[in-house]
Amino acid sequence: MRFPRFLAASATLCAVAFAAAQSVPVPNAAPSNSVQIPAAPAPAGASAWLLMDFSNGQILAGANPDARVEPASITKVMTSYVVAAEMKAGKIKRTDQVLISENAWRGGGGGTDGSTSFLPLGSMVSLDELERGMVIQSGNDAAIALAEHIAGSETAFVELMNTYAKKIGMNNTNFANPHGLSDPNHYSTARDLALMGRAMIRDFPEAYAYNKIKEYTVNGIRQHNRNGLLWKDTSVDGIKTGHTSAAGYCLLASAKRGEQRLVSVVLGIQTDSQKQGFDLRENGNLALLNWGFRFYETRTLYTPDKVIASPRVWKGKDNTVALAVATPFSVSLPRGKFDALKANIDLPKHVIAPLAAGQKVGTLKISLDGKVVAEAPLVAKVAVAEASFFGRLWDGFLMWWDNL
């Protein structure tokens, strides 16, 4: 009710604004066994690499994360993402029959130097089979056929790829084709590729599950998944290999152990030995994943149902508004460090109505040893309508007085 607040404010002719920055308790911050953390194992020969926590996108370790690289067939993760998004929108179905055009056959078929699903020219293949061929065997012909089926041409499909990439947050990426063969306008970064892998797992888990299939048979030809980590570690369930002479040997990987999932990417390993290239990209990723699981832990600190602050609302029908995070807010830290966390909230001096439910009002910042390690927007849990004319007028006067 505004009337009691009006009386209290009238008595003092002044209102104390909610603090611009306040400390708040950090839940789920009980200490765990502290361990001495060695440096992350840099993958041998890699020009860029990165390890990311899946739940929050935090980078745990990396080198040259924003250096421009050729993604090679890791590109096909974005092709898969577009396929899944278009399927979710009801524009295509797994049962669709897709024509293998001359463009798909010549650009990615058995007569090319790239990886292929050996799809016969002029044949009709189900969309589901094409997706398997692209994800498991890395078939360039399958990628082109999918692109043509969805958008009518590779060029139009690439526009979709770049549109979705920007939505994911891949700000330093540009795709020029759906398969990843070298092109001057086809590039990405380790950070962007990790974000892409994270988005694929998060947004389309059913489509992502294709990445852990070890082999399949099409046209009488048994084809194996090129991600050798699927055989080396049962916690690994994806995601995509890549290789061209310019890109080197590359691998974007993910593993889940318990409730923790990590995403790793190793790029740009140059060697004339295919076996060595395979081994280096696999062992480099596996070492990063093992290091991350051993020395880091991830905890959810706040959930949307937890009210973190209730600042005063000016010019509103309600005196206060409950603030919370919009989505579960987790933090990844070295083991044993959670008890040292500090949480602060940044709010404007005056929170002014009207406020919509879900509207950002402030920011929650989590710090360790004086350094901000994670932050999230604080949003209004409920809407707050404007007060009456006289209520707004009175609060306007009090805000003026408070600013003197």
Residues of each region from the PLM?
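N-terminal signal peptide c-region/cleavage motif recognized by signal peptidases
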Residues: 14-20
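Active-site-adjacent loops and short helices of periplasmic peptidoglycan-processing enzymes
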Residues: 22-194, 198-204, 216-219
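Domain-terminus/edge residues, biased toward the C-terminal soluble/receptor-binding domains
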Residues: 170-174, 182-404
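Bacterial N-terminal signal peptides that target proteins for export
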Residues: 1-11
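Structural motif marking the loop-to-transmembrane transition
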Residues: 3-4, 71, 127, 386, ...
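Sterically constrained small-residue positions within well-ordered secondary structures
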Residues: 12, 40-42, 62, 255, ...
